[in-house]
């Protein structure tokens, strides 16, 4: 599946410092140590209600990771899926009397348009689940063969499940205890009460065909992929086992990332005691976005959409700055005051970048690099550029190259355009 056109990224002199990120599994900030090519998998959208600000905040956070790796001199291999067949999509299509494939295609195109407007660097592999059913079938076959999976015999539908007991160190991604797992599993799409399961927490790998639902053939009967195994199979196929960063929103820590890792490690016979034997070497998660102090969610009907902001004439660079005003890991709130402050900040920066000269800027670029490399500390990076722009506006400066350097740095590191 095609992604979207990549924006140009200016090259800054020298190389940025090594990136350090909070690893959700180990619960520490530590250096990310890729080889020449840095590898990243970020879970994509289920294509309905795209693109709300929660989506945008997540993909902007990992856009920073992408940009900082490029600035540090790495090549980047970045894969992202699209969950273009799943219960929520089918339910929305049924509610709205739409063909589910048409709804998915419409929403995927809207997402592409929004990501392009926000100047998000596209993934190199942008993969729909419907394109990848063969990968999932092959993986489920392997899990059945090594007894990490089983077919539920009870009931009308022979669904296939993963045995959590088959995965060494199950639970290392979230750090949850059994009781917390059970609660969150039920809240986020799990089926602990399904008769015939070996363990209530065992996760669905293959949903046997039901009347009126899309299905594909497989050796274990027609059906469609479970949610978690889709990402396991796509990531293993496109960037391989033991990639550098698994990314997503914090609501994916459990069960999604926990089970994606469990499926992959059950296939590979690997454990989590050593980061080099994990599905991903680092698990990185972005916080949730609320609206006016309340949780932003589909169920509450208070989603704010990127496309709606753009239709109102909001500059996408201002949207980036508004979301960068808080730390990516923090749960934070969107309101009109936040957007207004971002628009004012963007105007100040653009004015300073338009001056014929300004204060020397090499130090501010170095500070931006250091702050961003320290677990994507955007508030401090923005403050560094604020200081330079205020000084430039108030007192000028004798460095004729400084405004252009600052504009290139804002573009390369933050994806924010200051000049036409």
Curated annotation (Swiss-Prot):
One example of a Gene Ontology biological process annotation: cysteinyl-tRNA aminoacylation
Binding, Zn(2+): 43, 231, 256
Cofactor(s) listed in the protein's UniProt record: Zn(2+)
Alphabetical keyword list: ATP-binding, Ligase, Metal-binding, Nucleotide-binding, Zinc
Highest taxon of the lineage: Bacteria
Residues reported in the UniProt entry to bind L-cysteinyl-5'-AMP: 43-46, 58, 81-83, 227, 249-251, 289
Enzyme Commission designation: 6.3.1.13
Cofactor note: Binds 1 zinc ion per subunit.
Placement of sequence motif 'KMSKS' region: 295-299
A Pfam short name: tRNA-synt_1e
Motif 'ERGGDP' region positions after renumbering to this chain: 187-192
Reactions this protein catalyses: 1D-myo-inositol 2-amino-2-deoxy-alpha-D-glucopyranoside + L-cysteine + ATP = 1D-myo-inositol 2-(L-cysteinylamino)-2-deoxy-alpha-D-glucopyranoside + AMP + diphosphate + H(+)
GO molecular function ontology, one term from the record: zinc ion binding
Chain location of the short sequence motif 'HIGH' region per the record: 45-55
EC class of the enzyme, as a word: ligase
InterPro entries on file: Cys-tRNA/MSH_ligase, Mycothiol_ligase_MshC, Rossmann-like_a/b/a_fold, tRNA-synt_1_cat_dom
GO CC terms in record: cytosol
PANTHER family in the cross-refs: CYSTEINE--TRNA LIGASE, CYTOPLASMIC, CYSTEINYL-TRNA SYNTHETASE
Function of the protein: Catalyzes the ATP-dependent condensation of GlcN-Ins and L-cysteine to form L-Cys-GlcN-Ins.
Assembly notes: Monomer.
Family that this chain belongs to: Belongs to the class-I aminoacyl-tRNA synthetase family. MshC subfamily.
Record NCBIfam families: mycothiol_MshC
Name recorded for this polypeptide: L-cysteine:1D-myo-inositol 2-amino-2-deoxy-alpha-D-glucopyranoside ligase
Lineage of origin: Bacteria, Bacillati, Actinomycetota, Actinomycetes, Mycobacteriales
């Amino acid at each position: 599946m095609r992604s979207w056109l990549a924006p140009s990224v200016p090259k800054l002199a020298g190389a940025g410092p090594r990136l350090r990120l909070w690893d959700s599994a180990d619960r520490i900030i530590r250096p990310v140590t890729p080889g020449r090519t840095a590898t990243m998998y970020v879970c994509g959208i289920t294509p309905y209600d795209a693109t709300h600000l929660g989506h945008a905040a997540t993909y902007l956070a990992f856009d920073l990771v992408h940009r900082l790796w490029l600035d540090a001199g790495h090549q980047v291999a970045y894969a992202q899926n699209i969950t273009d067949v799943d219960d929520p999509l089918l339910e929305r299509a049924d509610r709205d009397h739409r063909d589910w494939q048409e709804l998915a295609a419409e929403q995927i195109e809207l997402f592409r348009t929004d990501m392009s407007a926000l100047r998000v660097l596209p993934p190199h592999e942008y993969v729909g689940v419907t394109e990848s059913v063969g990968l999932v079938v092959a993986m489920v076959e392997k899990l059945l063969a090594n007894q990490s999976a089983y077919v539920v015999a009870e009931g009308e539908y022979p669904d296939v499940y993963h045995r959590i007991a088959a995965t060494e160190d199950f639970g290392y991604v979230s750090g949850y205890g059994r009781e917390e797992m059970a609660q969150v599993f039920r809240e986020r799409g799990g089926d602990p009460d399904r008769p015939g399961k070996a363990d209530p927490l065992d996760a669905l790998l293959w949903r046997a065909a039901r009347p009126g639902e899309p299905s594909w053939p497989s050796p274990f009967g027609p059906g469609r992929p479970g949610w978690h195994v889709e990402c396991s199979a796509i990531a293993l196929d496109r960037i391989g086992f033991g990639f550098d960063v698994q990314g997503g929103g914090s609501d994916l820590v459990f069960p999604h990332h926990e089970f994606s890792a469990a499926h992959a490690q059950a296939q590979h016979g690997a454990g989590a005691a050593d980061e080099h034997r994990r599905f991903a070497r680092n698990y990185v998660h972005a916080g949730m976005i609320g609206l006016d102090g309340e949780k932003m969610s589909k169920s509450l009907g208070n989603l704010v959409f990127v496309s709606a902001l753009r239709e109102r004439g909001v500059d996408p660079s201002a949207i980036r700055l508004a979301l960068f005003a808080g730390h990516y890991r923090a749960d934070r709130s969107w309101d009109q005051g936040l957007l207004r402050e971002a628009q004012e900040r963007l105007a100040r920066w653009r004015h300073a970048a338009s001056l014929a000269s300004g204060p020397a800027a090499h130090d501010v670029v170095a500070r931006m690099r250091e702050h961003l490399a320290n677990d994507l500390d955007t508030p401090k990076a923005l403050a560094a550029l604020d200081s330079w722009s205020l000084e430039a506006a108030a007192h000028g400066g004798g460095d004729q190259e400084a405004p252009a350097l600052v504009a290139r740095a804002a573009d390369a590191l933050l994806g924010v355009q200051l000049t036409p």
